[in-house]
């Protein structure tokens, strides 16, 4: 038995192929989910990948949030299905109300494309259980609107509830409190700006650190 991981594609998505490859590399069966799909085809987990869904018109993730497939993703997440949003996918999850806060223009207003070091701040999620506490990960970051912001009250709640999942070592985009990724209250929904699906082989690298997220999802699905 293995997990069936759905990978969503919107018009303008760029990283669905990479996310699918990462899921296959850990032994999952990949199911392609189109933005117009009205069901999730029996998947056990969902990845909402990066790119520029619908051209990022209005604002990043604002239109994708209303795609039919997202109604199903939200409903499945409410039932406890593991969901991972990467970069634009993180923006979509925030727009959909699955995660609090928002992603805004980077400090300096420049698109950032570089490898960054992250610290795993929580291993109590469906997507980080395979990591050691405070593990360091080297993964690519590529975004123009990657600065995480939220009201102070929300930030305090995230900190107090252990829902900050990843932090930047070198905060290149100005995210409040160095936050690179957060999770839902039950730890089943995770969003992060850097790209673990681009860090699955040391040869094409920068590392294979990103595989830990996908192995963690397998554990979450297979062990419940």
Curated annotation (Swiss-Prot):
Lineage top rank: taxon: Bacteria
Enzyme Commission number(s) of this protein: 6.3.5.3, 3.5.1.2
Organism encoding this protein: Mycobacterium tuberculosis (strain ATCC 25618 / H37Rv)
Domain Glutamine amidotransferase type-1 span(s) in chain numbering: 4-224
Pathways involved: Purine metabolism; IMP biosynthesis via de novo pathway; 5-amino-1-(5-phospho-D-ribosyl)imidazole from N(2)-formyl-N(1)-(5-phospho-D-ribosyl)glycinamide: step 1/2
Xref: Pfam families: GATase_5 (PF13507)
Biological process per Gene Ontology, one example term: 'de novo' IMP biosynthetic process
GO molecular function: ATP binding; glutaminase activity; phosphoribosylformylglycinamidine synthase activity
Subunit structure, interactors included: Part of the FGAM synthase complex composed of 1 PurL, 1 PurQ and 2 PurS subunits.
Catalytic activity, reaction form: N(2)-formyl-N(1)-(5-phospho-beta-D-ribosyl)glycinamide + L-glutamine + ATP + H2O = 2-formamido-N(1)-(5-O-phospho-beta-D-ribosyl)acetamidine + L-glutamate + ADP + phosphate + H(+); L-glutamine + H2O = L-glutamate + NH4(+)
The protein's name: Phosphoribosylformylglycinamidine synthase subunit PurQ
Alphabetically ordered keywords of this record: ATP-binding, Cytoplasm, Glutamine amidotransferase, Hydrolase, Ligase, Nucleotide-binding, Purine biosynthesis
Function: Part of the phosphoribosylformylglycinamidine synthase complex involved in the purines biosynthetic pathway. Catalyzes the ATP-dependent conversion of formylglycinamide ribonucleotide (FGAR) and glutamine to yield formylglycinamidine ribonucleotide (FGAM) and glutamate. The FGAM synthase complex is composed of three subunits. PurQ produces an ammonia molecule by converting glutamine to glutamate. PurL transfers the ammonia molecule to FGAR to form FGAM in an ATP-dependent manner.
PANTHER family in the record: PHOSPHORIBOSYLFORMYLGLYCINAMIDINE SYNTHASE SUBUNIT PURQ (PTHR47552:SF1)
Compartment list: Cytoplasm
Gene Ontology CC terms: cytoplasm; plasma membrane
Lineage, uppermost ranks: Bacteria, Bacillati, Actinomycetota, Actinomycetes, Mycobacteriales
Entry keyword tRNA processing: no
Active site: 87 (nucleophile), 195, 197
NCBIfam families the UniProt entry points to: FGAM_synth_I, PRK03619.1
Chief location category: cytoplasm
Annotated coiled-coil segments of the chain: none
């Amino acid at each position: 038995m293995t997990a069936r991981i759905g990978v969503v594609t919107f018009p303008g998505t760029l990283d669905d192929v990479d996310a699918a490859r990462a899921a296959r590399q850990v032994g999952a069966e990949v199911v392609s989910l189109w933005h117009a799909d009205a069901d999730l085809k029996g998947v056990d987990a969902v990845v909402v990948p990066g790119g520029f869904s619908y051209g990022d018109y209005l604002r990043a993730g604002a239109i994708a949030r209303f795609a039919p497939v997202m109604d199903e993703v939200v409903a499945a997440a409410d039932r406890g299905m593991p969901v991972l949003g990467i970069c634009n996918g993180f923006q979509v999850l925030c727009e959909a109300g699955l995660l609090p806060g928002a992603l805004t223009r980077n400090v300096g207003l420049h698109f950032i494309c570089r490898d960054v070091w992250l610290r795993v701040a929580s291993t109590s999620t469906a997507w980080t259980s395979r990591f050691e506490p405070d593990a360091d990960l080297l993964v690519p970051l590529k975004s123009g609107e990657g600065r995480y912001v939220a009201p102070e009250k929300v930030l305090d709640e995230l900190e107090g509830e252990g829902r900050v999942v990843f932090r930047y070592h070198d905060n290149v985009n100005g995210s409040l409190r160095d936050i690179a990724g957060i999770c839902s209250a039950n730890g089943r929904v995770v969003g992060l700006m850097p790209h673990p699906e681009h860090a699955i082989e040391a040869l094409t690298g920068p590392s294979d650190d990103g595989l830990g997220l996908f192995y963690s999802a397998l554990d979450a699905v297979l062990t419940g």
